Amino acid sequence: MKFSPLLDELIQSLRCLPGVGPKSAQRMAFQLLERDRKAGLKLASALSSAMSDVGHCQSCRTYTEETLCPICTSHKRGTSSTICVVETPADVLAIEAGGHFTGRYFVLLGHLSPLDGVGPEELGLALLERHLASGDVAELILATNPTVEGEATAHFIADMARRHKVMISRIAHGVPVGGELEYVDSTTLALSFNGRLPL
């Protein structure tokens, strides 16, 4: 069945979301049109505002509507000498949800991937190097993902940071709390044994 052009455009637009295929997009569109037009209009307004007004913090590169994000402008955290390097703004939210890190962040917005044309320039490493050269950074925590690309990115940044006499650490990888060993993959188990701590 052929839909109206506007409905078809809505369905096709919803498909840009991760994990949303044609059927899911169609269900979402029908839900908004049949049962919740008010929420649909609110979604459209929020989406339009976010797309036009949300940019990147000039210091850490996370999402913000201002020049600097709330963490970078915080009196307690904006002057912290510890920077945690992450791949995405979603990683910042995940770490913040834990409530244990009290320093600043630097968001790469990806990882090194020469085959995809992603090099140091695309990750904003010149800005990170300026932070390191300022003398205000005592420790750099590398919290890139434990993937081949994430590890390569962490090693590249560590080499860069060593030139500035900054302490470098890498977040631990291993068995998750509440996890059962029989379900943990061999690579994660090896990392857990290699990174074990004395009691």
UniProtKB/Swiss-Prot annotation:
Signal peptide: none annotated. SUPFAM superfamilies: Recombination protein RecR. Transmembrane segments: none annotated. Keywords: DNA damage, DNA recombination, DNA repair, Metal-binding, Zinc, Zinc-finger. It comes from the Bacteria. It holds the Pfam family RecR_ZnF. GO terms for biological process: DNA recombination; DNA repair. The keyword Lipid metabolism does not apply. A zinc finger (C4-type) spans 57-72. Residues 81-176 form the Toprim domain. GO terms for molecular function: DNA binding; zinc ion binding. Belongs to the RecR family. May play a role in DNA repair. It seems to be involved in an RecBC-independent recombinational process of DNA repair. It may act with RecF and RecO. This is Recombination protein RecR. The gene is recR.
